[in-house]
């Protein structure tokens, strides 16, 4: 049984307040500011979705390969434009044969001992050399041999014109920012640090050991090496 206080809280008409979750969407995912970059914000079309905007800018919004449900774009003549397949994706023999062979007869290779079908010999397993059809050499049964001959052309399709102008601007911006980060900026003494070091020198001169033991001017008990570095910077600024 609940306590009297809990029963009163349940009967109360005062709504229970919940802590507002900032930076999160309703589905619990983290809210991402897609307009954080000035170049992307300038070329962003609010009428399009995130995927459509990224595709138009020549970018990708996911590093993983699409798992289905990708949008099919139609050209003016009515044909459907499909994205090229990933050249690193390894097709199985059944997938490649299922695309080339329909219902009908096919050549198969059986195990001489068990009689089980090892593989189906399709049109892709035969090549024409000097006018004669010969079997494609694949002694290791490498599944990469099942890839189409047009794979290189398909993979080079979207990049045949090179990166877009927006991608080039983003690359130049990234190179500029990385070079600025790589440069190590020297740290200068603040105004309060200058006054503090000057007071220590006026009282103790060059005796750094006495500065370390001074509880009044050195309440944080800075080490001897730290004080020497600060004094050296202070002298460089005075010269």
UniProtKB/Swiss-Prot annotation:
Belongs to the NOP16 family. GO terms for biological process: ribosomal large subunit biogenesis; rRNA processing. Residues 1-23, 132-192, 210-239 are annotated as: Disordered. This is Nucleolar protein 16. Keywords: Nucleus, Ribonucleoprotein, Ribosome biogenesis, rRNA processing. It is found in: Nucleus, Nucleolus. Its main location: nucleus. PANTHER family: HSPC111 PROTEIN-RELATED, NUCLEOLAR PROTEIN 16. Component of the pre-66S ribosomal particle. It comes from the Eukaryota. It holds the Pfam family Nop16. Involved in the biogenesis of the 60S ribosomal subunit. InterPro entries: Ribosome_biogenesis_Nop16. GO terms for cellular component: nucleolus; preribosome, large subunit precursor.
């Amino acid at each position: 049984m609940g306590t009297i206080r809990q029963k009163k809280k349940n009967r109360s008409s005062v709504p229970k307040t919940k802590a507002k979750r900032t930076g999160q969407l309703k589905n619990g995912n983290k809210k991402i500011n897609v307009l954080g970059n000035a170049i992307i914000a300038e070329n962003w079309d609010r009428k399009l979705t995130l995927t459509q905007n990224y595709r138009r800018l020549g970018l990708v919004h996911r590093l993983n390969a699409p798992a289905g449900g990708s949008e099919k774009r139609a050209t003016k003549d009515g044909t459907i434009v499909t994205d090229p397949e990933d050249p690193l994706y390894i097709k199985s023999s059944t997938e490649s044969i299922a695309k080339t062979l329909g219902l009908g007869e096919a050549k198969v290779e059986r195990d001489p001992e068990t009689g089980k079908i090892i593989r189906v010999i399709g049109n892709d397993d035969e090549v024409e050399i000097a006018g004669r059809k010969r079997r494609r050499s694949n002694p290791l049964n490498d599944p990469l041999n099942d890839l189409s001959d047009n794979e290189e052309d398909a993979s080079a399709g979207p990049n045949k014109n090179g990166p877009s102008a927006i991608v080039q601007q983003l690359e130049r911006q990234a190179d500029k920012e990385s070079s600025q980060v790589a440069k190590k900026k020297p740290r200068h003494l603040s105004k309060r640090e200058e006054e503090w070091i000057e007071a220590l020198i006026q009282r103790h001169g060059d005796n750094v050991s006495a500065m370390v033991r001074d509880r009044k001017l050195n309440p944080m008990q800075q080490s001897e090496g730290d004080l020497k570095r600060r004094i050296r910077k202070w002298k460089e600024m005075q010269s």
